[in-house]
């Protein structure tokens, strides 16, 4: 369950000793979920620090996840790049009165002035079971989605940067391996499933590749049913006919079994809980062969690898030059190979970004191309950026393209 509270600034802000009035709005309430209320705020005199106070109640959870987004147009959009928060924010926040979040507005949004600033404070339950084996919990929360470095020209689809709230979910720590693919596919053959592509892999512990989007979706259903879970994909809007054969734009039961991540889920997971970084790691905004399996070249200033071309460890003269999953260090959420190795299919049709804030976006309702993310062993550093978007026909598969699956809490 989730609840939201709002706060509105009524006067110019971010002057060093500015004062301002405000109006507080009660948040939405849910009988069985968390409640955010009595949201109020004040700028500390002589500073550009802003204290956001609120009350937090919840009938059934010891801890909650709290997120904040900021608008400078009266709440029409929440696109202020606010990420430097401290205090009662993030995971593990206990219910109570007088909770305080401090925003370093001077760092995130220097030398800005507005008469229409509004905060949105959101709380969601932390009552999420431990992650299943081989998966990592991606906690609920907001992040800035898109290219904040302006690495791409306008029109490339990575901007505008916008605030997205994503509910909690589990994600495979590793790209699906050839061994796991074969295990599930072997089971599926006697249970009514049909695949257009067998799925290939350099070795059992390397990522599977060369499956199209439809086969990946059907495989997710087979994995769910093999483990006794309710499948996620169906051929009818009533969600009664499990998708097992053919090529269809499936309907989704979002609270059911294994499925592909949405673009927003994938990017939030890839960022590893950090904000404002180019790659899945947070200690540098550069990439080298010590970080990922990709095709290095000097054409990108953020590619500072001492070795160029294909990764020297995996360039053995036999295509594809994939690496064993988990060879490189994980990101902040414990996910491996979120940059390089193989591209990863996502759920979404390719579409343009909105400037407004969003909650659990799932992309356009139709389209021609499905998105994939993350770069590959054959692609340059440009494609390994967390904001980079690539796409292809859903009937398309190749030696550069694999996937990993996600699972909703409670499954």
Residue positions per predicted region:
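Bacterial N-terminal signal peptides
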Residues: 15-26
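Short, compositionally biased P/S/T/A/G/V-rich stretches that sit at domain boundaries
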Residues: 31-45
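Structural beta-strand segments of beta-rich domains
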Residues: 48-52
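Extracellular acidic, Ser/Thr/Pro-rich low-complexity tracts
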Residues: 55-60, 72
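A short glycine-rich, aromatic-capped structural motif
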Residues: 60, 127-192, 209-225, 264, ...
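Short glycine/proline/serine/threonine-rich loop/turn segments at secondary-structure transition edges
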Residues: 109-116
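Short, structured beta-strand segments at or near domain termini in extracellular proteins/domains
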Residues: 121-123, 398-411
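Functional-site microenvironments in short loops/helix caps that host divalent-cation chemistry
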Residues: 138, 144, 149, 213-390, ...
């Amino acid at each position: 369950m989730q609840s939201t509270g709002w706060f509105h600034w009524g006067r110019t802000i971010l002057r060093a000793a500015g004062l301002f009035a405000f109006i507080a709005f009660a948040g939405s309430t849910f009988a069985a979920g968390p409640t955010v209320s009595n949201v109020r705020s004040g700028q500390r005199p002589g500073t550009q620090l802003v204290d956001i106070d609120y009350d937090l109640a919840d009938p059934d959870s010891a801890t909650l996840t709290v997120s904040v987004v900021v608008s400078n147009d009266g709440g029409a959009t929440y696109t202020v790049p606010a990420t430097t928060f401290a205090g009662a924010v993030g995971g593990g926040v206990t219910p109570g009165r007088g909770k305080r979040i401090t925003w370093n507005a001077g760092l995130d949004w220097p030398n800005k002035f507005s008469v229409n600033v509004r905060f949105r404070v959101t709380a969601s339950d932390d009552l999420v079971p431990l992650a299943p084996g081989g998966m990592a919990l991606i906690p609920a929360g907001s992040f800035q989605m898109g290219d904040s470095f302006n690495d791409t020209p306008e029109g490339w689809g990575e901007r505008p940067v916008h605030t997205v709230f994503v509910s909690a979910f589990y994600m495979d720590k590793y790209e699906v391996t050839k061994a796991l693919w074969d295990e599930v596919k072997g089971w599926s053959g006697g249970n009514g499933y049909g695949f257009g592509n067998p799925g290939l892999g350099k070795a059992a512990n390397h990522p599977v590749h060369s499956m199209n989007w439809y086969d990946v979706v059907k495989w997710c259903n087979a994995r769910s049913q093999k483990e006794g879970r309710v499948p996620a994909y169906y051929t009818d809007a009533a969600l009664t006919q499990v998708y097992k054969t053919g090529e269809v734009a499936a309907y989704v039961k979002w609270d059911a079994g294994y499925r592909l991540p949405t673009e927003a889920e994938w990017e939030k997971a890839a960022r590893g809980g950090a904000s404002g970084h180019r790659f899945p790691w947070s200690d540098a905004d550069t990439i080298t062969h010590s970080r990922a399996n990709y095709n290095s070249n000097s054409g990108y200033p953020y590619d500072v690898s001492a070795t160029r071309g294909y990764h020297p460890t995996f360039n053995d003269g036999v295509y594809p030059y994939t690496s064993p999953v988990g060879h490189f260090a994980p990101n902040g959420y414990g996910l491996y190979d979120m940059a390089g190795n193989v591209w990863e299919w996502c759920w979404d049709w390719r579409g343009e970004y909105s400037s407004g804030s969003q909650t659990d976006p799932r992309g356009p309702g139709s389209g021609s191309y499905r998105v994939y993310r993350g770069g590959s062993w054959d692609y340059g550093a440009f494609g390994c950026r967390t904001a980079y978007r690539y796409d292809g026909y859903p009937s398309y598969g190749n030696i550069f393209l694999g996937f990993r699956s996600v699972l909703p809490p409670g499954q």
